Amino acid sequence: MATGKSGGSSAEDLGHHAGYYRLPNTHDARLFYFFFESRGSKGEDDPVVIWLTGGPGCSSELALFYENGPFHIADNMSLVWNDFGWDQESNLIYVDQPTGTGFSYSSNPRDTRHDEAGVSNDLYAFLQAFFTEHPNFAKNDFYITGESYAGHYIPAFASRVYKGNKNSEGIHINLKGFAIGNGLTDPAIQYKAYTDYSLDMGLITKSQFNRINKIVPTCELAIKLCGTSGTISCLGAYVVCNLIFSSIETIIGKKNYYDIRKPCVGSLCYDLSNMEKFLQLKSVRESLGVGDIQFVSCSPTVYQAMLLDWMRNLEVGIPELLENDIKVLIYAGEYDLICNWLGNSRWVNSMEWSGKEAFVSSSEEPFTVDGKEAGILKSYGPLSFLKVHDAGHMVPMDQPKVALEMLMRWTSGNLSNASSSFQRLDFTM
């Protein structure tokens, strides 16, 4: 894919790849991906980072072109280098998943996924195919990253990789950590935080807060039922709990619930028309090899298929990974309502693991970039929580330099002054 590059370098020269892997153990599922080799000084030795966009059903091309990819799309449909693309510090993969998202497809509806077991098995199969084609990258440190509904995908995917390594199922994947940005991971805790966050930020009044909070106990009970009995109760939980969010949404009107400082424009609250136009161009489609597959930024079909998964708690698999020195970074832009920092901070602090007390009692420290405070960081051992200033739901879009700096320090074990000194005592991070 070499559209709009100066000097006419080919995509291969730049180390840019795009294509499909057909997944074994499916009827006909094909996952579409982009792979950008690192522009950094260590090049091929930089970590391999995979990015998953949420939705469920939203294409990772959203992140590629608007957040942390190598380039942005200009109004004249040319590509402009992104100085803060994560390929500056990593070998970067974007994948359209679950099947049916973005350019990924299957000719067989039985390949539609409804839960994290199906999603994580497909992602594991994708990685095996990727490292079979790129064996020189298999030895590198490997990190899973993403945002929003990827707060569900990522813990399940990380556990699947960990299990695959443990059981010697295929190529060993050198999993070192995962990062979730403004994710939905523990709905019982996070849905309860909606009213608190909205009141704190002046989005609702105290009487509105009291009224909406009456729904919370029913929501909590419904989530509990979903966790024990599954299926239909999970749909019930989705309906009941989203009354909390929709009540707030009605009150805030045209405000963007991904960034409460901004108005909501268009169906996804942002103008994504450049990407949609660019991906319809015949020349682009030919170079990507996607034929006439219809591209939608976010697939309603995939979203509907995952409804029963929505209210499940994905925090449960994380403690085992922490105990095995897998680094976990939860970060959140402070102006996002839908997956707000408050709810994320609460589930991180209430998670049961051997370092819980030490994490909870560890002091917050400023996260500084260019001598300015860019966020507030709390760390202990392999676990870190970072609240990012002046950012909404999409931190790499709102604070690109801070996000790149975060990735670089985290993957090299220097996110926190405290954690790097701690690391020598106990954990190999």
From Swiss-Prot:
Keywords: Carboxypeptidase, Disulfide bond, Glycoprotein, Hydrolase, Protease, Signal. Glycans are attached at N76, N414, N417. Pfam families: Peptidase_S10. One of its GO terms (biological process) is proteolysis. PROSITE patterns: CARBOXYPEPT_SER_HIS, CARBOXYPEPT_SER_SER. One of its GO terms (cellular component) is vacuole. Disulfide bonds join C58-C298, C226-C241, C264-C269. Abundant in germinated embryos composed of leaf, root, and scutellum. The keyword RNA-binding does not apply. The active site is at S148, D336, H393. The keyword Signal applies. One of its GO terms (molecular function) is serine-type carboxypeptidase activity. Substrate binds at C339. It comes from the Eukaryota. Its EC number is 3.4.16.-. Belongs to the peptidase S10 family. This is Serine carboxypeptidase-like.
